Each structure stands twice: as C-alpha cells, then as structure tokens.
Amino acid sequence: MRRSALINIMVKAADKAGRQLLRDFGDVEHLTVSRKGPADFVSQADRRAETIIRDTLKEARPEFAFFGEEGGQTGPEEPEGRWICDPLDGTTNFLHGLPHWAISIALEQAGVIVAGLIFDPVKDELFWAERGHGAYLNSRPLRVTRREDLSASLFATGLPYKGRDNQDGMVASVERVSWASAGVRRAGSAALDLAYVAAGRYDGFWERGLSAWDVAAGGLIVNEAGGRVTDFEGGNRIVSDRSIIAAAPMIYDQLLQLVRPKSGA
C-alpha cells in the first residue's frame, strides 16, 4: 500500500521522536520524572518527544491544531484538522526499563478520525491506517483474528488509576473474562494493545478511563483491520465516553456481555 502524504508526515514525526525516545530509554535512570497523579508519571522523555512531534507536524501542516497529552491543545482557533498525540504511551513501562511502549498519533477532521499511527521504536513496528483504505503493519496488510471460540481467545486490558469504584468494576470484568477465555494480559500500553488486536495477536481489548490520545489512532486501526470498536454501551463515543471495547467481529458480542458494567460492578 502506498502511503499518503498525510501518513508520511505522521511517520516522519514518529520516527524523529522514536529515535529520541530510544536514546532516552538507554539513559532512563537519569531522566527527571514528575507525578501527574496516582501511578501516573511524566518524564523529560514524554515532553521531548511531544515537542518533536508537535514541531514536525506544525511545520508540515500549520493549518492543523495539535492536541497532546502533555501540552494540551495548541494551534489555530478554527483548524482544518486536529492531530491527537500521545508521545509516549506506556510511560511507567519506559521508566522501569520495560521495552513495551509506543508513540500514538491520529488526525481528526470534522469530528472524525481519518488517519492513525502507532509506532513501537523498540521493535521497529509501525501500525497505521487511513479511513477507508485498510490497516497495515509496516507494509503488510492487517486483519483481526477469525477466532470464534471465546474459550480459546486471548484478551488485553488495563486497570484505571483514578477512582476506587472504577477500578473495582474493571477488576470484576477481568475476573469474568479470565474465567471464560484463554487469558487476559495487562501489558501497560493501550495503544499497543489496540495495535495487537488489529494484528490478530489479541482477540480483543477493553478498558475504561482512557483519554482521546489513548484510543484515537488505535480505534481506527482496529476498524480498518476488520474489527469492531465501540464504547461500553455499544455506541461509537469511545473518546467522549472514555471507554472502549475492540475485538474481532466473531468475538465482540461475547466480550461485550462479559465486560459491560453490571449492577454494583
């Protein structure tokens, strides 16, 4: 698949930031780290990577706004589009020397995500998609798994840090899915979890308490790989609802029933 000019701009930004992140990862013990909330950290690496991505995208498309995890939204008041970026998804993994983290960049136009990219610099894996044109890992087309048997399926999730009640509900859903399936993994990067669903490595993923930069790119990539992506009510408000379920079509309904909030959960 030949990449469009927009995807090439995103790839350029991710590649530049990825090289900086790899340098920081090799010197992680010397990074300055601060805490944004319970178990929610930000480092020099996050900020440096976001600056690189923002500046690269702004130079190429000054008419677009930029919405990043660390710096909020900048750019024109009436932009033609908006970049949505997590410069380092999996910061806690990164700071502990675990090589499981990624860069996530999406482009939103008229309220619709039209392009998305997730880049894992450690493995040199680039997951990307454009609406209506399929999803790819580097240059290889992606398809979600065709597995139909829930008991043989492998899932991924994350547990929220904000609010005991919210976490208790997620723990309960993890227990239900674990009993019904081949297992549940919590690897610490929602972006890569979604990319792995698109690649057929996981059969599905669900999580609550996420932000736009966590799901914007990954949700599109899963959709373009043939998966189903909704919020916990089965709707399409994955950004505003702050919840997401993404799965292969034959597994989706079964997963939704298991993870949908129950009374008291």
Per-segment meaning from a language model:
Residues 10, 14-17, 116, 135, ...:
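Small-residue (primarily alanine) positions within well-ordered alpha-helices
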Residues 21, 46, 57, 91, ...:
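Residue-level signal for inorganic ion chemistry
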Residues 40, 44-46, 50, 69-70, ...:
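Acidic active-site catalytic centers that drive phospho-/nucleotidyl reactions
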Residues 77-136, 151:
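DPxDG-like acidic metal-binding loop motif
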Residues 143-265:
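An extended, acidic
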